Amino acid sequence: MENLKKYLEVAKIAALAGGQVLKENFGKVKKENIEEKGEKDFVSYVDKTSEERIKEVILKFFPDHEVVGEEMGAEGSGSEYRWFIDPLDGTKNYINGFPIFAVSVGLVKGEEPIVGAVYLPYFDKLYWGAKGLGAYVNGKRIKVKDNESLKHAGVVYGFPSRSRRDISIYLNIFKDVFYEVGSMRRPGAAAVDLCMVAEGIFDGMMEFEMKPWDITAGLVILKEAGGVYTLVGEPFGVSDIIAGNKALHDFILQVAKKYMEVAV
């Protein structure tokens, strides 16, 4: 338990360190400083600097752990402890001046996510959770919304801008969910979406073709807040996620099964 608490404290420190970089540079990134690392996939010096700060913090405390970042890959290997970090979740939002973005720091032991910290710098909101210790935002305990009514439910979603699938699959799922629930929103940052479901702002979420650094931290927070989730795909590879309170999770999962191979 003491180790778990230490891992959590380091995750929070690391998320805040990365978030400070994002705060200092928000609204200042120029077009010439933005690189296209892949089709419709952008990165700037801010992402890289944030990742460096986060890695410095983690490796200072746990030099034998593996740290896997979105921008600069993995450092260390062979440890059962792996940190998955997204130094800037919501890059497109960030470079366009839209304040929904975050730093995501998650720890996995073996195959199990055990610690997560997600920091939203613009709103100064720090979410955190650890296995068996609950989920919090700025020190306040959070729980998923106790809502079983589809017509009153809010769902967040995300489609990949560069898909390996026929986009009609996602559009069909969206359509079927849209007709049944009260509202749907696309904030544009998966870690933020998971935290907002954990906090009870929304009831459910569906995101497709996610990487482990996108969701590891948020999954811990969601689960500790009483939420449930289903991952479809490769463990710690590319995966789809359906999450929420039990009622919304189960509904979205049944819709997804109509259009995708979901083995659960």
From Swiss-Prot:
Mg(2+) 1 binds at residues 70, 86, 88. InterPro entries: IMPase, Inositol_monoP_metal-BS, Inositol_monophosphatase-like, Inositol_monophosphatase_SuhB. Pfam families: Inositol_P. It catalyses: beta-D-fructose 1,6-bisphosphate + H2O = beta-D-fructose 6-phosphate + phosphate; a myo-inositol phosphate + H2O = myo-inositol + phosphate. GO terms for biological process: inositol metabolic process; signal transduction. Gene3D superfamilies: 3.40.190.80, Fructose-1,6-Bisphosphatase, subunit A, domain 1. Its EC number is 3.1.3.11, 3.1.3.25. PROSITE patterns: IMP_1. It is an enzyme of class 3 (hydrolase). Transmembrane segments: none annotated. GO terms for molecular function: fructose 1,6-bisphosphate 1-phosphatase activity; inositol monophosphate 1-phosphatase activity; metal ion binding. Mg(2+) 2 binds at residues 86, 89, 214. Keywords: Carbohydrate metabolism, Hydrolase, Magnesium, Metal-binding. Substrate binds at residues 89-91, 185, 190. PANTHER family: INOSITOL MONOPHOSPHATASE, INOSITOL-1-MONOPHOSPHATASE-RELATED. Phosphatase with broad specificity; it can dephosphorylate fructose 1,6-bisphosphate, and both D and L isomers of inositol-1-phosphate (I-1-P). Belongs to the inositol monophosphatase superfamily. FBPase class 4 family. This is Fructose-1,6-bisphosphatase/inositol-1-monophosphatase.
